[in-house]
């Protein structure tokens, strides 16, 4: 039976969380994608439920090459032009700039639902799957430490923001928000994501 997956969406907070149980990731400004490969078919589902597989063939190819029987990833489709990414090129998608999936969570692997597992376990497994350099897909690194300091640095660098998540939580739908945080820079208010 095909499981349904909804992304754990971030919510705004006024400041970054602190404490040992939090991890912090760069907030990317791309298309949120639930990427799945089931029975050999790859789908790239947007938040609105559209399949963008035809729009991003390089992401489809990368997911097809993974040495797994089935997989579901949560991430952002990005279009990089040099060291930064370009949302307009991603949206207009003329295929003259390569897109990639920046994967930050593993939701299912080889038929096993990973959502009940703690984020620490999911990210560790995801890192092992994606530690090779893959064209079209990459693992989103995280930082541990003082969220306020990381958020301040993100603002200074002009980044879109940071996402802060409790390392011990399972992945949960957006209705369950209460224990996770996502600070968003260019000095926007902080945001939180339930995971």
What is each residue range found by the language model?
Residues 1-195:
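Catalytic cores of nucleic-acid ligases and guanylyltransferases
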């Amino acid at each position: 039976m095909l499981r349904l997956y909804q992304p754990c969406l971030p919510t705004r907070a006024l400041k970054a969380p602190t404490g040992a149980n939090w991890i912090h990731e760069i907030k990317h400004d791309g298309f949120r994608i639930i990427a799945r490969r089931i029975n050999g078919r790859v789908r790239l589902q947007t938040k609105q439920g559209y399949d963008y597989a035809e729009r991003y063939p390089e992401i489809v190819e990368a997911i097809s090459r993974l040495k797994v029987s089935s997989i579901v990833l949560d991430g952002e489709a990005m279009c990089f032009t040099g060291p930064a990414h370009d949302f307009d090129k991603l949206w207009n998608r003329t295929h003259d700039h390569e897109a990639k999936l920046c994967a930050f969570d593993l939701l299912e692997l080889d038929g096993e639902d990973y959502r009940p597992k703690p984020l620490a376990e999911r990210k560790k497994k995801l890192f092992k799957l994606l530690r090779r350099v893959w064209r079209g897909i990459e693992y989103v690194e995280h930082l541990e430490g003082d969220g306020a300091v990381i958020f301040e640095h993100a603002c200074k660098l002009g980044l879109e923001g940071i996402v802060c998540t409790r390392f011990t939580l399972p992945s949960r739908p957006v209705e369950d928000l209460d224990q996770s945080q996502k600070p968003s820079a260019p000095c926007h208010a902080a945001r939180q994501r339930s995971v």
